[in-house]
Amino acid sequence: MSGRAKQGGKARAKAKSRSFRAGLQFPVGRVHRLLRQGNYAERIGAGTPVYLAAVLEYLTAEILELAGNAARDNKKTRIIPRHLQLAIRNDEELNKLLGRVTIAQGGVLPNIQAVLLPKKTESHHKSQTK
């Protein structure tokens, strides 16, 4: 024997969250805990909370991007509920998904019925044909 003592075993690796491993911002561990506590099923697979967190993160990012565009169109730098309402109702798929959802302080979409708009005059058109 060389008489030299071992320098110790492997150091414990720094803990990595499941959100970090999946490359997500949404908390996979919290989603898993909520699925278990909600009694949705007797058993919850390991991939289920990852998938659900990814779906929630995608939908949130999509809505926030459209709401940010609506805020920028209104020359604002802060997203308010009105911008969320405009973003969701102007997007066909999001409107279908969130059709029965009421957004507090969201207002309504501006919409004027075609019959209420002023009639186009024919006098301008007739003068050009002569």
UniProtKB/Swiss-Prot annotation:
Record organism: Rattus norvegicus
Location of this chain's protein in the cell: Nucleus; Chromosome
Intervals of motif [ST]-Q motif: 127-128
Residues recorded as bearing N6-(2-hydroxyisobutyryl)lysine in the entry: K6, K10, K75, K76, K96, K119
Residue numbers bearing the Phosphothreonine modification: T121
InterPro entries according to UniProt: Histone-fold, Histone_H2A, Histone_H2A/H2B/H3, Histone_H2A_C, Histone_H2A_CS
Residue positions where N6-acetyllysine is found in the record: K6, K10
UniProt function note: Core component of nucleosome. Nucleosomes wrap and compact DNA into chromatin, limiting DNA accessibility to the cellular machineries which require DNA as a template. Histones thereby play a central role in transcription regulation, DNA repair, DNA replication and chromosomal stability. DNA accessibility is regulated via a complex set of post-translational modifications of histones, also called histone code, and nucleosome remodeling.
Designated name of the protein: Histone H2A type 4
